[in-house]
Amino acid sequence: MKNITLLGATGSIGKSTLSVVDLHSDKFNIFTLSANTNWQLMLELCNKYQPNYAIMVDESSAEKLSTIITTDTQILSGTQALDKVVAHQDTDFVMAAIVGTAGMSSALCAVKAGKRIMLANKESLILAGDIFMKAVEEFNAELIPVDSEHSAIFQCLQSGRSGLNKIQLTASGGPFLHTPISKFKYITPNQACAHPNWSMGRKISVDSATMMNKGLEVIEAYYLFSLTPEQIDVVVHPQSIVHSSVYYKDGSTLSQLGKPDMRTVISYAMSYPQRINSGVTALDLTNTPALEFYQPDFEKFTCLKLAFETLNKGGNAMITMNAANEIAVEYFLNHQINFLDIPKIIDQTLSAMKHTTPNSLEEVVNNDLVAREMTREIIKQYG
């Protein structure tokens, strides 16, 4: 029986994790659940799973939960509680599924405690990849990616890295793969949020539409698998059946295929090196549409090009790009800038920011805040 500390229990990754736990209550126990403000759903989860701890990051939400809960679950609040519980001696696995910079500290604390971290928090690698991966090595932590493309690479690399030539991340191409660039200016937020294959939140849907999401995954792969930028390739694959591939020097290519469902990835991270039932039915190749693959159009999808340039630049450039993208997408979703403005704003912010190399999470967070403020100033030129 493995004790799981689930950070971000009320989000989509959290819900999928719990659905896998439900199938294997003989193997996994929920030790801790965390959420930000959704105390109503947390109450339901506490009643069902009866964890030792429930953490509401928002203090007032924690107070509301503690006044109404009837189980023996201990209610905690604040980010420091997250940092403590991931390092608890009874925590075996940590599902790090808190979105954004808010999830970095607890993920790093889990690493420093030498836990198995099932990493769904992108920012830990995009913003603090050097810091994070050095800690993984130093504290002998076990890092397993919770992302369909990176999980695919992780699985394909189980045969070893000898003769590894390159990896290839697949991208759906988003809803505008076949839309002429001349029409990009008129794309609306609702159109950008209509992803063809995956059910996602609005921000990540826009990232998929600009292909920034794939650019961020390129940066994650660079750190996760200790690669050079030249060893990372992207191919557009609209069906999202092939999740990623690994190319070897002998001419062999290993790919991981499956239905687009995060439960497959999560169950693999939880059971590794074994495999367990995820609740997802197997792919039927005789009933699968024709698989298409295209080279990405860097002129149409400038954000992907920017991500490769940023990776080559290194230092705080990834922090700046991520911050500028988040602010630009927020303004786009609020109808304050158009779709084509997103990469322009990111590029301008990258040019304006001073280039440094952060050495701590505090420096990373500070750099992130400065980049966000600079992006807001740059956006004032638009509209």
From Swiss-Prot:
Positions annotated to bind Mn(2+): D147, E149, E217
Entries under Pfam families matching the protein: DXP_redisom_C, DXP_reductoisom, DXPR_C
Known EC number: 1.1.1.267
Protein name (record): 1-deoxy-D-xylulose 5-phosphate reductoisomerase
InterPro entries found in the cross-reference section: DXP_reductoisomerase, DXP_reductoisomerase_C, DXP_reductoisomerase_N, DXPR_C, DXPR_C_sf, NAD(P)-bd_dom_sf
Function: Catalyzes the NADPH-dependent rearrangement and reduction of 1-deoxy-D-xylulose-5-phosphate (DXP) to 2-C-methyl-D-erythritol 4-phosphate (MEP).
Binding site for NADPH: T10, G11, S12, I13, N38, N121, E123, G201
Lineage per the UniProt record: Bacteria, Pseudomonadati, Pseudomonadota, Gammaproteobacteria, Candidatus Pseudothioglobaceae
